[in-house]
Amino acid sequence: MSSNLTALPAGEACALETLIAPTPGGIASRILAKKGGGSVTLFAFDAGQGLTEHTSPFDALVVVLAGTLGVTIAGARVEAAPGTIVRLPAGVPHAVEARQPARMLLVMLRDAGAA
């Protein structure tokens, strides 16, 4: 994995809503940081959009910034509102659906020794 911590200006306070433009009827994403230990990606979803069910070999955290997300983990659904965080366990099927226009941070937690 390449070393990338330059997606954000150094030493500046950035408003998250200015870092990504929503896509009408779609999903927009922007990698904010990426290193061997993981990555941080900002997502903007239009209403009804989401990430279909999949698995990941690593744990991840969903941090809801705006809107409401339906998060399904191993068939169990939870509603996540702004200011909440949801852990997605490694190897467990999960999906995300925006009930309304929404933004989230996805923090991938890779093994520090992973390449």
State the predicted function of each range.
Residues 1-37:
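A short, N-terminal "cap"/entry segment at the start of jelly-roll beta-barrel domains
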Residues 25-26, 36-56:
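Conserved short histidine dyad/triad with adjacent acidic residue
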Residues 39, 68-70, 77, 93, ...:
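Structural motif
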Residues 44-46, 56-71:
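Short, conserved beta-strand element in jelly-roll/cupin
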Residues 51-53, 71-72, 88, 93-99:
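Short beta-strand His + acidic residue motifs that chelate non-heme Fe in jelly-roll/DSBH
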Residues 65-66, 81-82, 100:
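A cytosolic small-molecule/anion-sensing beta-strand core signal
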Residues 75-90:
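Short acidic-glycine-tyrosine-enriched beta hairpin
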Residues 90-114:
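Ligand-binding loop in jelly-roll beta-barrel domains
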